Amino acid sequence: MTTYSDKGEKAAAFYCSKMGFEPLAYRGLETGSREVASHVIKQGQIVFVFSSPLNPGNKEMGDHLVKHGDGVKDIAFEVEDCDYIVQKARERGAKVVREPWVEQDRFGKVKFAVLQTYGDTTHTLVEKTGYTGSFLPGFEAPRVKDSLLSKLPNCGLEIIDHVVGNQPDQEMLSASEWYLKNLQFHRFWSVDDTQVHTEYSSLRSIVVTNYEESIKMPINEPAPGRKKSQIQEYVDYNGGAGVQHIALKTQDIITAIRHLRERGAEFLAVPSTYYKQLRENLKSAKVRVKENIDMLEELRILVDYDEKGYLLQIFTKPMQDRPTLFLEV
């Protein structure tokens, strides 16, 4: 997951101190990269890259930052046959931003290619068969180690569960069809505005996934309501379609959120009336929540449930000044 930022080093440090990540790799002037500095961080199997332009002539990154602010530019997929996927995607009409190319260092070779998806977002295909480096060719170990990080509590975030892309009205279907057509994904789940709505706003959503269902990409669009929806607000502030939030999975959300709050991570406020209503609703529900509701209320963790089971979730405040990208645990 690559985010463009005009302060990549500071953004990476923020995610490390507040969200429990650790520095993994670096590329910049010291490593021979004259155009872009990239700071790579990792937690569990989650890898984020924060990239910043190094000179005023970098029009592509400059234009992206002016239009969108700090935000996700690229979602990388590790693949087994980069050439085949690019060939099939091109035959089906996908825009190939960059044809397959190879980079190498003493740890081996890696093949890449880049495809265009919704908005200005791209997917980099990464074929790294046999590569033994800690990240990718051209990157080195972080130059500086923050001694404070080892003193902070572990957060236990493990993998990326899903990545949500928000679209302008009437563009959800074409964005989701792109994945079905070009990457051979299939539809996993969908809802319309009769199913997800409040008195004031609503949304439509289609979730697409790969064959193994290990990658899930919800695609949302706003639906008409009495007030501007969260989806429309995102589209307005982002200057079009883009990644709205990244969901990170943990096996122990109680400990994770307690530790994240101790680190200073900020989450959306939840009124106490939510938990009062939740207790009432659960009395007649078929599902039984094993966690202590008082504990969930203390940490402001939400409960989403139906007759098949439940999940616990919480949303951060926006991770930058614009009310665009946020995280879900």
Q: Where is each model-derived feature located?
A:
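Core segments of cupin and vicinal oxygen chelate
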Residues: T2-V47, E91, P100-R106, V114-T117, ...
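Generic recognition of stable, solvent-exposed alpha-helical segments in well-folded globular domains
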Residues: D6, K10, V36, D70, ...
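Active-site-adjacent "gating/activation" loops or surface patches in catalytic cores
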Residues: L54-N55, E212-I231
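Non-heme Fe(II) oxygenase catalytic core, chiefly the N-lobe of the double-stranded beta-helix
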Residues: V126-L180, Q184
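An N-terminus-focused feature that recognizes amino-terminal "leader" regions
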Residues: M1-P142, H162, D169, L296-E297, ...
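Short, structured motif recognition centered on aromatic/hydrophobic residues
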Residues: M1-S5, Y15, F21, I41, ...
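Long compositionally biased, domain-poor regions of proteins
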Residues: I215-M217, N238-M319, L325-V329
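Active-site-adjacent structural elements in folded domains
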Residues: N58, K145-S150, D192-D193, G225-E233
